[in-house]
Regions:
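Cytoplasmic helix-loop-helix junction between adjacent transmembrane helices
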Residues: 123-162
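Helix-loop-helix hairpin linking two adjacent transmembrane segments in secondary transporters
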Residues: 158-212
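C-terminal transmembrane helical hairpin of 12-TM major facilitator-type secondary transporters
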Residues: 323-362
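Conserved MFS/SLC helix-loop-helix module at the cytosolic interface between two early adjacent transmembrane helices
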Residues: 79-117
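Extracytoplasmic gate region of multi-pass secondary transporters
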Residues: 48-52, 252-311
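Cytoplasmic membrane-interface "Motif A"-like loop-to-helix N-cap segments
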Residues: 90-101, 319-333
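Helix-breaking motifs and short loop linkers at transmembrane-helix boundaries and internal kinks
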Residues: 60, 92, 113-118, 289, ...
């Protein structure tokens, strides 16, 4: 299977007079492909969260069992992000990403026909493992086509894909329920999003690009020599493209203190984010006494409110903080803590929704 994901041969060289136009077009296509692809991963991930009230009602699962299912998927996803991203270094980004989407879709079809708890557990673990195939190709594609001075804004644009994807899950599933009815809740919750994900996987294959060299263009360093970064390496060390995934990890990740700082911060960011996403439906329905329609609106606001703030954060980190990402992250984490207290203590529908949106923003 891994051999099918390997990078293909380089395309014929683009004529010199067409290089600039082709480069501009290809890099926009490459960015659009990973935007749409990563968006689709969230369609076949967050749909599980929206199905949790029905897991309680229709399959009689307890809150503890639902929490265990969510934890299994997220732990598998966390492990997979590291492993799959390493494998993606040696694969075709577009094929790797599309393959992961199709596998997630297949797992969701399985969820649409399952009723036993342990079958659900096995399938959500598989879904978590395949979900990890989305982030690596995205980072690789952005690094291949965009110089460092643009990556704050480009990364911010790409990052809103998961908010768009998470935000459109509720309308997709809601429309499926309207058409199929609540008696077909599994089809509406799992099979319909799976079909949508397959359509997006096809778009990734059509739009996606390899590195500039693989597309017959000069490398990024040749196109933008002012952005060329000379890596200081130890004597005799091999170039990254000739190193194994394990060697790259040991050299550029394990010994990189900045990578550890970012990982440490990310632990707490994801703790809040996935804690909110995983429990928001049940919490709002059972504790805050929202209706299912009101809960869906709050879920949508949590995701979509992050879109403008993410773009603003990318611009601020590039312009105001001169490329330093950590100060803004610390400010946002402090504000998140304050807003979580408001989310917890508020009783009115409006204020709970507002604090939900602000946490999503940050």
């Amino acid at each position: 299977m891994l051999s099918l994901l390997k990078k293909g041969p380089s395309a014929n060289k683009v004529p010199a007079e067409k290089i600039q136009a082709t480069y501009g077009r290809y890099r926009m296509q490459a960015l659009l492909s990973v935007f749409l692809g990563y968006l689709a991963y969230y369609i076949v991930r967050n749909n599980f969260t929206l199905s949790t009230p029905y897991l309680k009602e229709q399959l009689d699962l307890s809150a503890t069992q639902i929490g265990l299912l969510s934890s299994c998927m997220l732990i598998a996803y966390g492990i997979s992000k590291g492993v799959m991203s390493s494998l993606a270094d040696k694969a075709s980004p577009k094929v790797f990403m599309a393959c992961g989407l199709v596998l997630c879709a297949i797992v969701n079809v399985g969820l649409g026909f399952s009723t036993a708890f342990w079958v659900f557990a096995a399938l959500v673990v598989l879904n978590g493992l395949f979900q990890g195939m989305g982030v690596g190709p995205s980072f690789i594609t952005i690094a291949n086509w965009f110089p460092r001075r643009e990556r704050g804004r480009v990364g911010a644009f790409w990052n809103i894909s998961h908010n768009v994807g998470g935000g459109i899950v509720a309308p997709i599933v809601g429309a499926a329920f309207a058409i199929l009815g609540t008696e077909h809740w599994q089809s509406a919750s799992y099979i319909v999003p799976a079909c949508v994900a397959v359509v997006f996987a096809i778009s990734v294959l059509v739009l996606g690009k390899g590195s500039p060299r693989e597309e017959g263009l000069p490398s990024l360093a040749e196109m933008m020599p002012e952005e060329k970064v000379v890596l200081k390496t130890k004597h005799g060390q091999k170039a990254p493209e000739n190193m194994s995934a394990f060697q790259i990890f040991c050299t550029y990740v394990l010994r990189n203190k900045n990578a550890w700082y970012v990982s440490f911060v990310d632990v707490f960011v994801y703790m809040v984010r996935f804690g909110m996403i995983s429990w928001l439906p049940i919490y709002l329905l059972t504790v805050k006494h929202f209706s299912k329609e009101q809960m869906s609106v709050a879920f949508l606001f949590f995701e979509w409110a992050a879109i403008p703030s993410t773009l603003l954060a990318g611009w601020l980190s590039d312009k105001l903080f001169k490329g330093r990402r950590m100060p803004l992250a610390i400010i946002c984490m402090t504000l998140i803590f304050i807003c979580l207290i408001g989310y917890w203590k508020s009783e009115s529908l409006l204020m709970v929704t507002v604090f939900t949106a602000i946490v999503g923003c940050l």
